[in-house]
Each structure stands twice: as C-alpha cells, then as structure tokens.
C-alpha cells in the first residue's frame, strides 16, 4: 500500500488480518503531494497512523498477534520471527519503490537514492502519483523538461537525475522495456 501512497486511517490490531492485510472500512486516503506525515483520519491528532508510521504499526500489530500465540509457540521463536519484520519490510519496500523507477536489482545504495528522491518530492510538494506516472516517460537528464518544470529547485532535481542516468546505464535495460515495467506499477489514477 505504501508504494501507491495509500494511508490507512485506522490500522488497529482488529483491522489487520492474520495475513497482514488491512480490512478496515473506516477513514483512508492517498497522499497527494508527497508528505510522509500525512494523516487521513481527523481523529488521529497525534499522527499514530500517519503515512510514515504505518510500517511500525504493522510491527505493533504483529507483536499483539505474537502475544496471543505465546501458548502455542515459544517466546524465543516468536521473537526471532518478529525480528525479521523490519528487514523484510525494508527490502520489499525498496524493491517496490525501485520498480517505480525502473530499477530491477535494488541495492543499499538504491535505497539511499530513493530516499533522496522522496526528500526532494517532500520539499517541493510534488504530487506523488503524477510524478511517478510521469517519470515513466523519462529518457535522460537532458530530456526531462516535462519533469523538471514541476520543481522550483531545479538544481536539486537535476542532480538527482544525473545520478538516475548513471543508475539506468548500469541496468542496461532498453528504454521501452523499462517504460513498460514502470507503467505497470505506477498508476495513472488512484
């Protein structure tokens, strides 16, 4: 859900299935301009369920499930399982975010590269969905006026694009294949 900017307004333990799927029909939303602190529930004044907090709420919910299973599974085994959450979530999150940029083999350096882009999007208040859909048409730093025009701080985005060009060259993936892959994971509308 984070890949597309979806925000659960209430992500309590009773609103999450044993498979980790959320099943609440209460408040929800999609981030417009990228804001990790976005809250879609007017009663969540402290931001417990803010966009950036949703992964840790998932872990909180899994801890609650583990407490319910302690009579069936040892505390040590449950603890070992829960310790894998952050690494597993982080790996999958960056794979999904990398796919939005056409990056097929995400490395630790890519996660920093993605974080850098998100900081730029946040500072510039760029529409999350539209940006990622638009970047599907990206060719190179020199041919990105359609994207660069969205940014007030063009120098910051231009610097990111220069690094993006380097990363795309490393992939050695034809532009049309990359574009097709990106269109499949970057919705036009949410």
Label the model's feature ranges.
Residues 1-4, 96:
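Phosphate/ATP-binding catalytic cores across multiple sugar-kinase/actin-like superfamilies
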Residues 3-8, 12-61, 67-71:
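Catalytic activation segment of kinase domains across protein kinase-like and atypical kinase folds
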Residues 40, 45-190:
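Regulatory N- and C-terminal appendages and interdomain linkers associated
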């Amino acid at each position: 859900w984070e890949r597309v900017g979806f925000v659960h307004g209430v992500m309590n333990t009773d609103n999450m299935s044993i498979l980790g799927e959320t099943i609440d029909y209460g408040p929800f939303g999609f981030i417009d301009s990228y804001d990790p602190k976005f809250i879609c529930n007017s009663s969540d004044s402290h931001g417990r369920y803010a966009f950036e907090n949703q992964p840790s709420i998932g872990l909180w919910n899994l801890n609650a499930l583990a407490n319910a299973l302690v009579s069936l599974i040892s505390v040590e085994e449950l603890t070992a399982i829960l310790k894998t959450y952050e690494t597993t979530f982080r790996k999958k999150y960056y794979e999904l975010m990398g796919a939005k940029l056409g990056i097929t083999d995400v490395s630790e350096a890519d996660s920093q590269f993605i974080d850098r882009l998100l900081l730029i999007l946040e500072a510039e208040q760029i529409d999350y969905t539209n940006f990622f859909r638009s970047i599907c048409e990206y060719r190179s730093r020199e041919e990105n006026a359609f994207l660069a025009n969205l940014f007030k701080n063009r120098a910051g985005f231009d610097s990111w694009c220069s690094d993006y060009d380097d990363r795309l060259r490393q992939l050695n993936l034809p532009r049309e294949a990359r574009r097709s892959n990106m269109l499949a994971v970057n919705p036009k509308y949410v």
